[in-house]
């Protein structure tokens, strides 16, 4: 069985035991999160009741891969290079 959940305006299709990276959550490592489920999906793509919630545990807080922002104005000797690493939270789905 799978569940469709929303975390920080992003939707994820998860099943029990999945590990995924989501935008930074205000929870300590080892805390359990209760996430409202939008829909429960059976193996035959049948939508079940959406009254359940999903339990997840926070594994760690990490940074995502670096994204380079490069600006340049030709013939003006102007170059600007910045990097950004988004903070993410690694979670594991315990139960649906």
From Swiss-Prot:
Keyword terms: Ribonucleoprotein, Ribosomal protein, RNA-binding, rRNA-binding
InterPro entries: bL21-like (IPR028909), bL21-like_sf (IPR036164), Ribosomal_bL21 (IPR001787), Ribosomal_bL21_CS (IPR018258)
Top-level taxon of origin: Bacteria
Complex formation: Part of the 50S ribosomal subunit. Contacts protein L20.
Biological process according to GO: translation
Any one GO molecular-function label of the UniProt entry: structural constituent of ribosome
Pfam families (alphabetical): Ribosomal_L21p
Organism: Chlorobium chlorochromatii (strain CaD3)
GO cellular component, one term: ribosome
Protein name: Large ribosomal subunit protein bL21
HAMAP family reported in the protein's UniProt record: Ribosomal_bL21
Protein encoded by which gene: rplU
Family statement: Belongs to the bacterial ribosomal protein bL21 family.
Protein's UniProt keywords contain Nucleotide-binding: no
PROSITE patterns: RIBOSOMAL_L21
